[in-house]
Amino acid sequence: MSEFSVSLAKLAEEANLTIAYTPCELDKIQVTATEVYRPGILLAGYYENFDSKRIQIIGLTEMSYLDELSTSLRNTHLEKLFSFQPPAIVLTRGMQPLSEMMQFAKQYGVPILMSTEMTSALMGQLITTLNTELAPRITRHGVLVEVYGEGILILGDSGVGKSETAIELVKRGHRLIADDAVELRRVSYRKILGTAPANIRHFIELRGIGIVNVARVYGVGAVKLSESLDLVV
């Protein structure tokens, strides 16, 4: 399990999900699992090794299967799913929740969200967001810039000219991601993503000048929210 969490409200905003039912405000519900799950095997009656921390995705296959079940069997499997109290159940392809789903959602306090996306597309989007938000991370003293599409982390002692180097690169058409404090997240085994803490984003501190808002002085094209780390100097 990740030591970090992300609110269901942020995930819903990122994936453009709509609410069918929620027991409380979505920003009060925290998600800690980096994976999502299609509960087809659980709906077939196999409940072992079910990870209730994952968001559950119900697509056309699962919904078609539920339609073929008898009322009593459908209720049994749906109640079992909701009784695990996952952080949310998401219906894809614009499908509406069954009346039984709404009943058990209210009984067990499980949010039901809806998406118009295809199931695989939504799962990919959610996993990407979860991997970014829940990734292991560290903060390093340095400057992160994008030079010809490559993310370059400039390290060194205080006062050696890291920020001055970065601003000269910005003047030449390259982009600033973070100055002074660089937050590095390992979003996959092969990718480290660098960004700036929100309170200092787009700012750079220069000797003899002070703090400069790079986005205002050089335009929004001179800054970037994040960049993958390709080189350390």
Predicted features, each with a name:
Residues 1-81:
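Gly/Thr-rich phosphate-binding loop signature of adenosyl cofactor/nucleotide-binding cores
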Residues 48-52, 81-85, 146-147, 225-227:
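Flexible, charged surface loops at secondary-structure boundaries
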Residues 54-57, 87-90, 110-113, 151-153, ...:
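Structural motif
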Residues 85-88, 94-129:
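Charged, amphipathic alpha-helical linker segments immediately N-terminal to NTP-binding catalytic cores
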Residues 129-149:
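P-loop NTPase nucleotide-binding/switch module
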Residues 144, 153-155, 177, 183, ...:
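Structured core elements
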Residues 149-177:
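Glycine-rich phosphate-binding P-loop
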Residues 178-231:
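Conserved nucleotide-sensing/catalytic segment adjacent to the nucleotide-binding pocket
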